[in-house]
Design a protein with these regions (language model features):
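Extracellular zinc-dependent metalloprotease catalytic-domain scaffold
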Residues: 1-222, 231-365
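Conserved beta-strand->loop/alpha-helix structural units within folded catalytic cores of enzymes
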Residues: 226-227
Length: 365
């Protein structure tokens, strides 16, 4: 995940008190067009339009004040922040990926670099236009829903106008697809610098598991809505970036990077107990007696208010997160035992709903 995408200074975004409906822009990878016609029509004409419309009507954000120009991928994890912009060391990677999709050149910022000591910071000149066109012609993973405008050597990228979130969509039978009965999965790939909000993400449809039967449509649509929300904010990889109602971080930031501390083993940023807290029950009743049991709860203000009201329990610390299912399920969904058919639990249940609890979490991001 790439952070510190520069769009506007933080003080400008914080002062913009009126939120606007979320605007999502969709870009297809070539793999989507290679699907059989019935599956392409399902995605293009029904599933994605309805899922995107649902979240655009349900969520509001501080309006993005200009085009989204995504950061280029650096060869290493180390970057320098200069003037609110991330700078790579000496060079940028030739390709910047978002999930299975190569981000188009005209969606990217220039290549900002510094030397290994953080000095001599500058914009690295792009490859000659002819070379870039040759690279694009050879790339089988580019987007082709419209032709990219030609870029001169000096011209800045156009970025993505009139949008708050860019969703790159692919349809590739990946290893993750083959692990189980996975219809689709999604995640964010870049966050803006001012408030850490995700501004780009990817969604991959698994062709082998994508059903076009009418009876399966509600299930597929619910799954895609669920996955898009992971990219928009409901994700353990974003917990450490949540902010309070004044736009201040809920997790302390490192002075050298401006980001929360990184868990090197899990490769995710560590959140504070103002976001997710480990709770221990000393007398957890089971058949035949009591045991000690620990679990993780979301303890942000609106979530606490909603979960206490839901269970009519004024002492409840927060909303419990799933503790089973391994990577991709545990800690990034609501606990199924408690929240049953809530759409953001880890397994699909008929008649799933997005409850006030999930919307409270999104408000607390």
């Amino acid at each position: 995940v790439i952070t510190n995408v520069h769009i506007e200074p933080a003080h400008r975004v914080k002062k913009r008190s009126i939120d606007q409906p979320l605007r999502i822009s969709i870009f297809y990878d070539h793999s989507v067009y290679r699907l059989e016609a019935t599956k392409f029509d399902l995605i293009n004409n029904t599933i994605l339009p309805e899922a995107v419309k649902f979240w655009e009507q349900a969520l509001k954000v501080r309006k993005t004040g200009g085009p989204i120009r995504l950061n280029r991928k650096c060869p290493t994890r180390q970057v320098f922040i200069r003037g609110s912009r991330a700078h790579c060391i000496d060079s940028c990677k030739a390709d910047t990926m978002c999930g299975e999709v190569k981000v188009p050149e005209h969606h990217l910022s220039p290549c900002y670099v510094c030397n290994s000591t953080g000095h001599d910071c500058r914009i690295l000149s792009p490859a000659p236009a002819a070379e870039r066109r040759a690279d694009n012609d050879d790339n089988g993973n580019a987007l082709n829903d419209y032709d990219a405008p030609p870029l001169s050597d000096e011209e800045d990228s156009t970025g993505v106008e009139d949008s708050d979130f860019v969703l790159y969509v692919s349809a590739v039978e990946t290893e993750r697809c083959r692990r189980g009965l996975t219809v689709a999965y999604a995640s964010h790939c870049q966050q803006e610098a001012a408030l850490d909000r995700p501004v780009a993400g990817h969604a991959n449809f698994c062709p082998g598991e994508l059903s076009t039967k009418y009876r399966d449509l509600p299930s597929v649509l619910a799954t895609v809505k669920h996955e898009i929300l992971h990219a928009l904010g409901f994700s353990m990889s974003l917990f450490a970036f949540y902010r309070d109602e004044n736009g201040e971080p809920l997790t302390e930031r490192r002075p050298d990077t401006g980001n929360p501390p990184l868990d090197e083993e899990l490769q995710i940023h560590k959140w504070s107990d103002r976001v997710v807290k480990n709770i221990t029950r000393n007398k957890w009743m089971i058949r035949g007696g009591y045991v000690e049991r620990s679990f993780n709860m979301v303890v942000t203000p609106r979530v606490v208010r909603e979960v206490r009201q839901h269970f009519n329990c004024s002492e409840l610390e927060g909303a419990e997160l799933e503790d089973q299912g391994g990577d991709g399920t545990a800690l990034t969904h609501w606990e199924k035992r408690l929240f049953e058919n809530e759409a953001m639990t880890g397994t699909h249940t008929q008649n799933s709903v997005f409850s006030r609890l999930t919307f409270a979490l999104m408000e607390d991001t």
